[in-house]
Amino acid sequence: MKRPRGRPARDAAGVSRDKMLTEALDLLGTVGAEGFTMRALAARLGVNPMTFYHHFGDRDGLISAMADQAYSSISDPEEGTPRIRIAGVLRAYYARILSHPDLTLLIFRRPKAFPREARRITEVIAQLLVEAGMTPQRSRLWVGILVDFTHGAAIAVAMAMNSENNAAGDKGYDYAQALAELMNGLGA
């Protein structure tokens, strides 16, 4: 008998949305961006691949939700000058990117998957730059500089950690020190 269209059949495991996201992030960390597929995730969870489309709409929706989960713990430190708070947000973001570098690569490949949490983080940084005395236009420019620097630094370190030549990562690289040097160029 053919099943009617609509909501997918309830999977025996009754897997929650949070469990799907946790397993998706774990699978991505294991197989990398190239090996991450809806079918592989479905097999891992023992569910129908259509389950993800029901919960997330499409692959971009799943990737966006994964990023929202990964980045949701990043917040604006409430104490300190705007510059100190910006550095705190960026160091936390760097740490999350370093924890999930393949997630960042997936987002770069699929711009429709750009997560709400990443937008929130950039808005926090932009507001703090304005509080530091920048115009909104200059703030937007510096948000791009700071966030792109953070992406590049985290991905470079993650790639070095995964390379056969440098299994321990680049121990000589100090993101906090490099960020401090860059922040000195703010002039705010």
Cite the ranges covered by each PLM segment.
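Amphipathic alpha-helical segments used for helix-helix packing
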Residues: 67, 94-124, 155-163
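Hydrophobic alpha-helical connector segments
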Residues: 75-115, 136, 143-146
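N-terminal intrinsically disordered/low-complexity leader segments
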Residues: 1-15
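A contiguous pocket-lining binding segment that forms or flanks enzyme active sites
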Residues: 122-143
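Short hydrophobic clusters on alpha-helical segments that form packing/core surfaces
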Residues: 20-28, 66, 70, 93, ...
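C-terminal peripheral helix-coil segments that are non-catalytic and often amphipathic
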Residues: 1-4, 131, 159, 163-188
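Helix-turn-helix
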Residues: 19, 23-61, 65
